[in-house]
């Protein structure tokens, strides 16, 4: 099969289909199809989950970021380092399945996670759940229409390190 974007047109839909391939919107078909897909993804979570870590070893704070927020996070991290904070970065390349295992491991070694998001808290809830009280999960929200100010992220990182 060609990959999406490789020059071929194909129809993609959110419909569920029965075992014959025909669209079916019954509760039973929905449950069967969605459960199969979710279990398939969860079963391969270790091979699907992708993230890039930088300087997390020995860090007091880890910034967990994704998407465009990662670029601004990098600037905030640099500012915090200039103030003497030991801060690492975990940039999520794949958001789901979530990097639960690694967040759990890091939560036992760091004081806090700082999570900048251009919303009012989605991924921070996953970080908080996985940290399970071992480390704080601090949201740095942004309403949109732009990106975070690196100084605001620096302030959050410095505060989390105390």
Question: Which residues fall in each region the model found?
Answer:
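Flexible, low-complexity linker and terminal segments
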Residues: 1-162
């Amino acid at each position: 099969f060609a990959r999406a974007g490789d020059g071929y047109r194909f129809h993609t839909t959110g419909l569920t289909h029965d075992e014959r391939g025909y669209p079916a919107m019954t509760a039973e078909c929905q449950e069967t199809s969605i459960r199969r897909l979710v279990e398939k993804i969860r079963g391969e979570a270790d091979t699907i989950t992708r993230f890039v870590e930088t300087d997390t070893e020995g860090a007091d704070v880890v910034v967990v970021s994704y998407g465009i927020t990662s670029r601004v996070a990098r600037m905030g991290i640099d500012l915090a380092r200039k103030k003497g904070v030991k801060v690492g970065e975990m940039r999520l390349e794949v958001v789901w399945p979530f990097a639960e295992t690694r967040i759990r491991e890091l939560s036992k070694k760091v004081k806090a996670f700082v999570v900048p998001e251009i919303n009012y808290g989605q991924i921070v809830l996953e970080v908080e759940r996985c940290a399970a009280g071992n480390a704080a999960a601090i949201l740095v929200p942004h309403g949109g229409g732009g990106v975070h100010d690196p100084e605001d992220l620096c302030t959050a990182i410095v505060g989390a390190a105390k």
